[in-house]
Amino acid sequence: MFTQKSFEIFKIEGLEPRMTEIRSEIQPVFSEIGQKLLTELSVKIPNQEFYFHIAQHRRRTANAPENTWSAISTKVRGYKMEAHFQLGIWEDYVFIYLSMIDQPKKQKEYANLLTSLSVEKLLTEDFVISKDHTKAETYPLSAFREAAERLGKVKKSELEIGRVWPKERFNSKEDSIILAEMIETIDQLLPIYQKLMEV
């Protein structure tokens, strides 16, 4: 599980020094939790193959990443082409999102579906949304409909929905509770995810 050291990594200056620590400290945690999330998805959707990806940030040549993530998708490559699950970390929190970023192929179809859903009835009120995967800001669930409409109108718009865990909770005492909450987050998002995969 993540520790306080995981969050301190984002204070390290320089691309290579930070990436070295991300590879040694954060990516093994992604793999550990990711396998448990993969198992959950495989149990809930047994007829679908899922693949686990870890962001490598290979296109970066100068600036160190301000966050990093892993993803679960039905695609062997190109997970951003479709709605997918992300487990990631910023300097202040860890997140699990159902993500539609970087102009997925069915962006307009996703938007049409999402604007028709009453997410407040499907998800608990502690869920949040993100409108840009490159920024740490999150918004309450009440902002979902507007963001979903924007996803259909603005080509470069994005939408992620899920839960965040503030860094203060990662003190080893709550590890099993947090893991259970992560799995439960996937379970709550599954009905929305399955509808998205049908469009």
From Swiss-Prot:
Q: Which SUPFAM superfamilies match?
A: YktB/PF0168-like
- Cysteines joined through disulfide linkages: none
Q: Which domain of life is it from?
A: Bacteria
Q: One Pfam family name from the record? A: DUF1054
Q: Which family does it belong to?
A: Belongs to the UPF0637 family.
Instruction: Provide the protein name.
Output: UPF0637 protein YsbB
